[in-house]
Amino acid sequence: MIQTTNLTKVFGARTAVDALTLTVHEGEVFGFLGPNGAGKTTTVRMLTSLIAPTAGTARINGFEVGRDDTAIRRSVGILTETPGMYDQLSAQKNLTLFARLYEVGDVPGQVEKYLRLLGLWERRNDAVGSFSKGMKQKLAICRALLHEPAVVFLDEPTSGLDPEAARLVREFVAEIKAQGRTIFLCTHNLDEADRLCDRVGVMQQRLLTVDTPTALRRQLYGRKVVFHLREVGAGLPALLQSFPFVKEVEQVENKLLVGLDDPDAQNPVLVRALVQAGADVQFVGELRHSLEDVYLSLIQRGTTE
Amino acid sequence: MNKILTIIDKEWAEIFKNRLILYTMFLMPLLFTALPLVMLGAMGGQSAGDVTDMPPQFLQLCGELQGTECYQLFMSNQFLLLFMMLPLVIPATIAAYSIVGEKTTRCLEPLLATPISTVELLLGKGLAALIPGVAAGWGSFALFALGAWILVDSPALLARLLDGMWFIAIGVVGPLVALAGISVAIMVSSRVNDPRTAEQITMVLIIPLLGLFFAQIAGVVMVNAGLLWALAGALVLVDVGLVWLGARAFQRETILTKWK
């Protein structure tokens, strides 16, 4: 659905995007993570044919950036960093104008459908300038979907929203994902990426890595199991370390953190050994690193390399 | 064509909510129409005075008109140039707001992300600015013609007040001046961040017209049909160059990445 090969953008002496090679599959929610100035917005602008790449190629929906720009703009929807609505005009007028520019067949029908879907129908005649930030963001999402695009680019969709509005937007993103659309989601909100994205890519001028959030955690930290004991006896860490499949054992207060490849199969063996050694096992769980840990670690690596 | 009409619709929907532009669109034409009519009305029935105070070239242009009528024609002709300025002032104000305004409201990126071409966008914005300006010029002249028909008793003076020269000025030179103003506004707006700056720089175009205005008052130049056709011809050349430069200056990428 989205395919880039060595996509590069240079502004003067500064390389904003460096040889980005990436594939985003149909129906996938792809999270595009990276610090400010990492080249996320520049990438989105290239993929939506707003700016031309300096080098490399990109194909969206089978159309090539730089050659089929109008076709690309017709087939993608974009939510820009700031909603950018005409504040003096009503919500309905705003959407009607964009529906006409996107050559939508049934303009009034599509406008009504999306205003109702996002709970803005009752306020359709109000000037957008009187809307809250969350309402403007919802209206901008409506605008991005009016022409029913197969690919939707969302640049920081929940940025600056209060928790309730942010949740509404996230729920709506999940809904449009369920409709089978491909979503390219730029975000700083790693919790959001964790919840919504099938895969994430971490960007810092160049693409540092791409994988599922779970695989990224494992790639960086492996899998760790926490054994909560009533008390950690003196020989217990060594006992666990004696198993060939145990990678590492770390004691933190009354917990033993054990690195394993296959906890489903290996946990029962270790629990049995601990019980036989007289330990009181209170409970066992997998240690989950947040996507934030993974992200920060990758960015730090990317900076030092 | 549909996209051009959509842009015009959007521009006008915004214009009619912007008081500053509305005042410019309605007050200035009313003022420019009222002044010559008040002057015509006030001078009617007055004694002739010494017509030799007027530029000698103008006395020749008066032809069979004598005394007060010659004065009335002379004074009305000064306003001819003001009527020509209307189609410049109004579109320049609208164009400056409509183009730079997209940036200040951060609407330009979503707009450029639609399948609209640069030509359609500029044509839509240009026409949205040009039509009210030209309409204001023509409307003002129609009001002036109606007022003159009511106020002026002399058929000879009325015929001279509404002769072909005025139609060249309002119908041909005015729209060409407006087109020049819009092209300059587009060029300036691709370089500046503030609509007022774009408007002020565009207004520099008024200087040659004001120069013509004062030159006529001083008797250095007499505006006549020949001069207006020459001016129209020059403006066609200038417009072709300015439209080309304006379209080139409107670089989507530069505007998106350099406008802060």
Give the label of every model feature segment:
Chain A
Residues D106, E122, K247-E248, V275, ...:
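Residue-level detector of short coil/turn "hinge" positions at structural boundaries
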Residues V65, R230-V232, P263, L287-R288:
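Short beta->alpha junction loops/turns
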Residues P263-E305:
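C-terminal coupling/interaction segments
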Residues V128, N254, L287:
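Residue-level "edge-of-site" marker
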Residues R170-D261:
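ABC transporter nucleotide-binding domain
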Residues E26, E103, E122, E231, ...:
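Non-catalytic surface loops within mature trypsin-like serine protease
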Residues I2-T4, K9-Q204:
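ABC transporter nucleotide-binding domains
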